[in-house]
C-alpha cells in the first residue's frame, strides 16, 4: 500500500496532513440578492499566501516612516511608488502560461491565475496609497487640481492608475464572465496602455522594473509560438489519416450531441498528453482569432484528441451551430464540410496533476461536463489494471513506474439529464467490462471499481444547507429502454426488471407542475442522498429519458457473470444528488494507504467536496497515531 513506513516519512506525512487541513479549509458560500447569486470563497491556503504578500508589501512601504508626520507624506509617496513598481514582474510571471513558478511549484497556469488577479489587486492598493499620499501632501496647499492639469508626470501617473483600476474592475468574475472573448481582447489592450503609461511615469533609473515584465511576456509568447509551430506544422509530423492539410497537422470533425454539446475529434494529433490535461483550441474558419481552453476527454492510446464542449455563448455556441448545421443526422443537405473536417490549431497541453496510480484509493467526483476531466483519469488507471491482469506489464525495474498501486476507484458523476449519459456511455461500459474480465480471469482479483451516476434536475447542482432524507431512484445499466430498479438493503441486492414502455402503475411519470414525486412535495432529483445503501425507491422522470443506443448495450449475462455483483458490472444510476462526505468516508475506511480525492464541477460541488475532505481528515486524525492514511485533494475548477 501507498503509505509511509519510516520515522522520517511518518513525520513528513503528519506535517503534510496538518498543512492540507489548514490550506483546504473554507467557509460556506454566501447567498445574496434573494438567493439569485452565490459568492464562493477560496480555501484558506491561497488566502494565507495572498495575505502574507500583502503584509510584506505594506511593511516595506511604511518601514521607518511616520504616517502622522506631514513632512513624511512625500517620502511615503515615493516609497509606495517604488514598491508598487517592483510588483510588476511578479504579476506578469503569474500571468504567463510558460513560467518558472508553475514549473517549480508543480502548478498549472490556471491555478496561478487566481494569484495573478490578487497580486494585481495588491498592486492597485499600493498604487492607490502612493497616489493618495501625494494628493494628501498637495491638498495642504490646494494644489491637486493644478498638478493634474499642468504636471506631465502627474498626468501620466494618474492615467496609469485609471487604466489599472479599469483592469482590476473588469477582472472581477461577474464582469469578466459576461463575455470571454471581449474580456481577453480588452485585457490585452489595456495592459499595453498601462505599461506605456507606467514607463512614461517612472524615472529612467528604475525603468528596468518595466522592462523585466516586458521580457517575461516576450519569453512567454516566443515559447508558446515556437511550440505551437512545431505542434501544428505538418512538416514535423506525419498525418497517418491522410485527411489533413499539407501545411497544417490537425483537422477536426464536429458532431452535435445531446444537451447542446459539441464533440470535437482530431485524429492522429501531433502532441503527447496525459489524462486530465487540456489544450487551447483554435478554429479560424468557425471562430476566427479566438482560442479557447478545453479538457482532453481521450487518452493517448486512443490516438485522437476528443473534446466535449457545451454551447454557452460566443465561440462555443458557434461551434455547436456549425456542428448541427453540417451533421448528416440532422438532415443537412450538404454535409461535405463536416465529413471533410476543418483545420484547427492546438496549443498545449497544459495542466498538472499527481499521477493517481501512486494512491491506494481514488475518489473521482464530477458534475456535468466535469466528467471530461475525471473520465480519462478513470480510464488511465483501469487500462493499467487490464494490462497487469493480462501480463502485458512486467515487474522489472524499467516497468515498475507503469504499475498502479491503486486498489479501488470510486467514480461519481452528477448530471442534469439522462441524455448526457451518451457522452461517456461507451467509455463507461468499456471500463466496467474490462474490470469484469479481470475478475473472471482472476477470481480473487483485489481491485475494486464502483460507479454511480446521479441524475438531478437542479440547475446549479449545489448541495442544500442541510441533508434531506435519503430517497432516490436507482437503475442499473446505461440504457433507459430497459431499466433495472434496485432496492439495496445492507448487503442484499434485489433486482427488478422494468420495461421503459410498461404501463405498470410503478412506471415513472413526469411530476405535475408545482408538485413533486415526494410525499411532502418537491422532487427527488434535488434530494441529497446521504447513503446509497439505504434508498427508498420513488418515480421521477423530470430529467427526461435517455436515448438508447443498441450498439453499446451491455452484453448478455452468462453463467460466469452471475458471480459478479451487479454493482461492479454496471453503473448505479440514481435520481438525486450525492452526499460526498459519506461517499469519501466509505472509501477511506477501506484504504490501506494514501487516498486521492479529485473533483471537477460547479463551485457548489467543489466546495462541498473540499469541506468533506477537511472534515474527514480531522475526524479520522490522519497521520496522528490512529492509523488513518493521508488524503490528497485536487479541485479542478470550471471557468476562467
Give the predicted meaning of each segment.
Residues 2-31, 234-262, 468, 473-478, ...:
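Non-transmembrane, juxtamembrane loop and terminal tail segments
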Residues 111, 307, 312-316, 321-323, ...:
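Reductase modules of NAD(P)H-dependent flavoproteins
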Residues 15, 19-226, 231:
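Membrane-embedded alpha-helical bundles of multi-pass integral membrane proteins
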Residues 75, 84, 88, 99, ...:
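Acidic, Ser/Thr-rich intrinsically disordered and amphipathic helical segments
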Residues 1-37, 304, 528, 541-569:
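Extended, low-complexity, polar regulatory segments
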Residues 266-363, 379, 385, 389-393, ...:
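FAD-binding FR-type
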Residues 81-82, 110-131, 211, 216, ...:
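Classical protein tyrosine phosphatase
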Residues 166, 173-176, 185, 189-199, ...:
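Membrane-proximal cytosolic interface modules of multi-pass membrane proteins
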